[in-house]
Amino acid sequence: MNLPLEVVFNKSAAKSLEALDAPTRKRIKDKLEAVAADPLNPRNSYPLQGTNKRSARVGGYRILLLIQEPNRLAVDIIEPRGQVYRRI
């Protein structure tokens, strides 16, 4: 049985998460739990072309992630869809 990955946030992602309303914050945390449990499942996240990052969708928000070995999921960016891909 595979253990879920440890989820770590960089400073800007943590700040973005805390700035969101409570229901959206909960939905994002739930999605991160699902990604940590099975990060390569296409229902949870998908690879971004030209990078080593993955993206997860929660409503109008996108979460950019990086799977770090051996058991860490780094949350890089949490932003609205219209803004997030400009920062890659």
Can you describe what each PLM-predicted range is?
Residues 1-7, 15, 19, 25-26, ...:
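Enriched for short, Lys/Arg-rich terminal
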Residues 10:
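Residue-level signal for threonine
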Residues 33-56:
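A short, surface-exposed loop/turn module that caps and links secondary-structure elements
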